[in-house]
Amino acid sequence: MVIGVLTLQGGFAEHIAILESLGVEHRRVRVPNDLLGLDGLIIPGGESTVMDKLARAFDLAEPLRAAINNGLPVFATCAGLIYLGTVENPAKGQQTLGCLDVVVRRNAFGRQVDSFDAVVDVEGIDANVAFIRAPEVISCGAGVTVTARVGDHVVGVRQGKIHAYAFHPESAGEVRLHQAWLASI
């Protein structure tokens, strides 16, 4: 099994460290050819608008969209969730992949100073996670399953082979969500 990690910007190093700790072969994804032969893809947190601009600059956005729409399993955190869905009130010129049938509100939990750690039930796993300028899902299409909530906020979803979270398990050293996703591939 070879898992790609989108390494345009953001928190990809923590995801790579988790894959290495689990003994999973991985490849950094920056250009379209890096997608060839992957069994799954991790889209990390970071800044969704920068991720979008860089993916377009490297001619990666359309191949990413095609690979995901053709069934490539995806594990996404924070900005990765935003990049997969549709954004409520997007930044000027911001584009997303639109592969996940959700509408996302950016920075739903406040600014950087409002970041917090929490234990969140994700389909029976009490996951230790970090919320850092975290988004929330404000609407889901019929094919989307809600997998995690914090109060009234939807913070985890699954659609087919896409598992997406508003939070950062990797920042808290939480590996069980990665393990569950890898086992589902």
UniProtKB/Swiss-Prot annotation:
GO terms for biological process: glutamine catabolic process; pyridoxal phosphate biosynthetic process; pyridoxine metabolic process. L-glutamine binds at G46, E47, S48, R106, I132, R133. Belongs to the glutaminase PdxT/SNO family. Pathway: Cofactor biosynthesis; pyridoxal 5'-phosphate biosynthesis. Pfam families: SNO. The active site is at C78 (nucleophile), H168 (charge relay system), E170 (charge relay system). One of its GO terms (cellular component) is glutaminase complex. Catalyzes the hydrolysis of glutamine to glutamate and ammonia as part of the biosynthesis of pyridoxal 5'-phosphate. The resulting ammonia molecule is channeled to the active site of PdxS. It catalyses: aldehydo-D-ribose 5-phosphate + D-glyceraldehyde 3-phosphate + L-glutamine = pyridoxal 5'-phosphate + L-glutamate + phosphate + 3 H2O + H(+); L-glutamine + H2O = L-glutamate + NH4(+). The lineage of its organism: Bacteria, Bacillati, Actinomycetota, Actinomycetes, Mycobacteriales. Keywords: Glutamine amidotransferase, Hydrolase, Lyase, Pyridoxal phosphate. InterPro entries: Class_I_gatase-like, PdxT/SNO, PdxT/SNO_CS. PANTHER family: PYRIDOXAL 5'-PHOSPHATE SYNTHASE SUBUNIT SNO, PYRIDOXAL 5'-PHOSPHATE SYNTHASE SUBUNIT SNO1-RELATED. In the presence of PdxS, forms a dodecamer of heterodimers. Only shows activity in the heterodimer. The keyword Hydrolase applies. It comes from the Bacteria. This is Pyridoxal 5'-phosphate synthase subunit PdxT. The keyword Transferase does not apply. GO terms for molecular function: glutaminase activity; pyridoxal 5'-phosphate synthase (glutamine hydrolysing) activity. HAMAP family: PdxT. Its EC number is 4.3.3.6, 3.5.1.2.
